[in-house]
């Protein structure tokens, strides 16, 4: 606080009442800014009481990434932007479960619940982890919207089509295929593993035919190779419901 209240001038004479009042107002304004931690800066774009002012205030020790993550979570927004792993699948299931519990406690009717949004930009990943996230979405009473903002490849493709509503960015891309698997052990265990994997692939097929307009004939044609799609193609095949023209 740089200002002080002055009653006399440099010669020792009493200052006019108007000047004393201005001095009091300046001190009060300084004190008020210090209390809220929002001093004005030279940049006129940053208002003293704005959130940006608080975040950029050098006196505040704020981890921007941590703040962003917390705000996203409070906004019911999740990001699937890496390889899909079992650990991350548990995290997504927990967050979906959390908001269902909140809505249940608040007794909010399903049709009035604020949706959980999953933003997707992923190359895919573990098949079991993929199914875990798909099941969490399917079992959620609170609506879960999927928004493919970049890559909806492999496992991320199957998660994307699971949303109660499915959206895509204008330049989002999609890759449908059944992926690959590794198996080891002796011959008997190898055969068992192959049979079980075939069962999982059949589940992927049922999931795809249920949630898209991809026909069984087209599925069989592309399941062992790659079917690439633009956002427009994704609309055509019922992979997404809408191409976004603004951020949700």
Please tell me what each predicted stretch does.
Residues 1-248:
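Terminal-region recognition feature
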């Amino acid at each position: 606080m740089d200002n002080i209240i002055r009653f006399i001038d440099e010669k020792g004479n009493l200052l006019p009442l108007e000047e004393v009042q201005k001095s009091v107002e300046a001190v009060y304004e300084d004190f008020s800014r210090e209390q809220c931690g929002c001093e004005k800066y030279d940049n006129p774009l940053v208002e003293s009481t704005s959130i940006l002012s608080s975040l950029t205030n050098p006196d505040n020790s704020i981890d921007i990434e941590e703040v962003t993550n917390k705000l996203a979570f409070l906004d019911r927004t999740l990001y699937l932007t890496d390889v899909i792993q079992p650990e991350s699948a548990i995290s997504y299931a927990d967050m979906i479960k959390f908001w269902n519990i909140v809505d249940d406690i608040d007794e909010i009717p399903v049709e009035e619940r604020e949706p959980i949004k999953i933003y997707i930009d992923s190359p895919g990943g573990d098949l079991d982890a993929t199914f875990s996230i798909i099941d969490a979405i399917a079992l959620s009473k609170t609506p879960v919207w999927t928004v493919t903002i970049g890559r909806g490849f492999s496992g991320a493709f199957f998660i994307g089509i699971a949303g109660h509503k499915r959206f895509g960015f204008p330049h989002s891309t999609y890759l449908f295929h059944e992926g690959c698997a590794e198996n080891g052990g002796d011959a008997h265990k190898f055969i068992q593993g192959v049979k079980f994997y075939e069962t999982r692939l059949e589940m992927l097929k049922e999931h795809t035919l249920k949630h898209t307009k991809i026909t069984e004939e087209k599925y069989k044609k592309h399941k062992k190779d790659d079917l690439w799609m633009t956002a427009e193609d994704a609309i055509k095949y019922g992979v997404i419901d809408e191409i976004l023209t603004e951020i949700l």
